[in-house]
Amino acid sequence: MEHYEQARYAPAEGETNEPLLSENDQTTVSVDPSLPDDLTRDTVELPSLEEPELARHYVRLSQQNYGVDSGPYPLGSCTMKYNPRFTEDAAALPAAAVHPDRSETALQGTLAVMHDLQDYLGRIGGMDAVTLQPPAGAAGEFTGILIAEAYHEATDGGHRNEVIVPDAAHGTNFASAALGGYDVIELPSGDDGRVDLDALEAALGENTAALMLTNPNTLGLFERDIEPIAEMVHDAGGLLYYDGANLNALLGRARPGDMGFDIMHFNVHKTFATPHGGGGPGAGPVGVTDELAGFLPDPHVRQSAGGDYELYTPPRSIGKVHGFQGNWPVLVKAFAYIDRLGDSGLADASAKAVLNANYLADQLDYEIPLGPFHHEFVASAGDQDAADVAKRMLDYGVHPPTTKWPELVAEALMTEPTETESKRTLDDLADAFNAVAGDDDAALADAPSRTTARRIDQTAAARNPRLSWHDLD
């Protein structure tokens, strides 16, 4: 192993030194003289490796990693479902490999897919108009905040400077509102884990621009008072924003627009399997009611009276939030997923997600203090440290749940198995949970003991990060 780790960066003395780059006849390269010396270098500093060493390096890395193709991934509020390969096939079609700067005439097929995806998402969410431009879920949130800001500026002078966010909301809700220039008002949850109507009434006022909600919330609980909540927000002159993180629990059974939400974003990497991770690209489409459609980003796709598809600028558009029409390959995957499953398939996926969460919860030895829940639940590790539980679960070959959050549950284990796990997998996952629940303190404190990397000193890693192979000893 030590020899292998060394060989990644430089061959041992006497070994071949095969360059990864081909020889170049150009002996000199012009460098911008304005660049400082510490940003220029004489060599590219790539490791010199033979092809077998390089192949083994990446295979070994893949064996040390864990993803949805490795096993269950019950990371709460993340919807880590299996990503079917047919969506990759769709995105790899030659017809999808088009440059966005081509003429509208040459892009009719592309624009047709985008137009239909806008329609699909609008019908799923109960929204009147949808933009596909935002490149990620958080970017979708920020786009929604910009739309709310533009709406209030146009309708009541823009004096509203507060956005209300529940204490159990995703951190991006707080960040998006703050980035939009709003003061964030944190809304305490009730004892049942849901919105406290009295607390909401106290928080609402003439400066309220919006309330951001996830429904079901991060505890997996459906906001049963969503209709009076919507009425209260609207009576105060605010808008109701839907964070689509947990939309997987509602597909085909309920729609945010029907609940009174004015704006929502879709996390296509969660709900529509586009997939997660890898540093992107992503997509965070935003849906709005008809009253807000004129504020959508520029340009938007529509169908002309003659049947052709065209780009147009909404009359009070907030402008661009991303280049061209967003991350096209990701949108193709979302389109393929929705088109393949159809209305009944999406509803079935949602029902199975809720069923799987409830089945798994019923098998666990850990207490689950709040319910009834939908697609996810939050168990309490009790006297155990939730972070230790997570590390110990790695020893049993499964990915741990989200830990320590929401803080409404002590030592929280937020768990979302998704619809793509079988009963056998759920039983194995329950066995892992329960084995950890019965472990002694020593086993928890030492975990993980069966993984390639042992427990990391998180404090030292934060204070002294090693971000390059130059930093290795």
From Swiss-Prot:
Enzyme class: oxidoreductase
Cysteine disulfide partners in this protein: none
One GO BP annotation of this record: glycine decarboxylation via glycine cleavage system
SUPFAM superfamilies linked to this entry: PLP-dependent transferases
InterPro entries: Aminotrans_V_dom, GcvPB, GDC-P_C, GDC_P, PyrdxlP-dep_Trfase, PyrdxlP-dep_Trfase_major, PyrdxlP-dep_Trfase_small
Catalytic activity reported: N(6)-[(R)-lipoyl]-L-lysyl-[glycine-cleavage complex H protein] + glycine + H(+) = N(6)-[(R)-S(8)-aminomethyldihydrolipoyl]-L-lysyl-[glycine-cleavage complex H protein] + CO2
GO MF: glycine binding; glycine dehydrogenase (decarboxylating) activity; pyridoxal phosphate binding
Region listing for Disordered, in residue ranges: 1-40
GO cellular component: cytosol; glycine cleavage complex
Protein's job: The glycine cleavage system catalyzes the degradation of glycine. The P protein binds the alpha-amino group of glycine through its pyridoxal phosphate cofactor; CO(2) is released and the remaining methylamine moiety is then transferred to the lipoamide cofactor of the H protein.
Family: Belongs to the GcvP family. C-terminal subunit subfamily.
Protein name per its UniProtKB record: Probable glycine dehydrogenase (decarboxylating) subunit 2
Organism per entry: Halobacterium salinarum (strain ATCC 700922 / JCM 11081 / NRC-1)
